[in-house]
């Protein structure tokens, strides 16, 4: 499944990806806790995004995947071409947090019942590696 589905946004993304600098690149390994994995139906979406550690919560880079109910590990790369707003990229931030969220609602907003994991705040280098464990449930606070 693709949120772009042959739209002009998808074409914009492909053109940007081909021509613009991708640095910095964040390599992410996502591990899903066994208790959460047992509740996955295969109808969920996995949102992986990086945002500033303070200030605006707008994703600086984002990717979205279908969740396989038997898959425990995901390997994801985020880079400058995956921003939602042209001047709000990974390279525009001094420090970021990376979050991985599984949702049955398939919406960008975090909802009660979503499963989530996040990194600690980190400074961005030209190459970064992060391990995220999805091991928490979002409550309706």
What are these regions (language model features)?
Residues 45-51, 97-101:
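Beta-strand signatures of extracellular beta-sandwich domains
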Residues 64-86:
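A beta-strand/beta-hairpin structural motif
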Residues 85, 102-115:
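Short acidic/polar inter-strand loop motif in beta-rich domains
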Residues 40-47, 91-94:
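Short coil-to-beta strand junction motifs in C2/discoidin
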Residues 14-18, 27-31, 73-78, 120-141:
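Extracellular beta-sheet/turn segments enriched in Thr/Pro/Gly and aliphatic residues
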Residues 83-95:
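Short glycine/proline/serine/threonine-rich loop/turn segments at secondary-structure transition edges
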Residues 16-17, 60-67, 86-88, 117-123:
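Beta-strand-rich interaction surfaces with strong enrichment in secreted/lumenal proteins
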Residues 29-39, 82-85:
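Short amphipathic, basic-aromatic surface patches that mediate peripheral association
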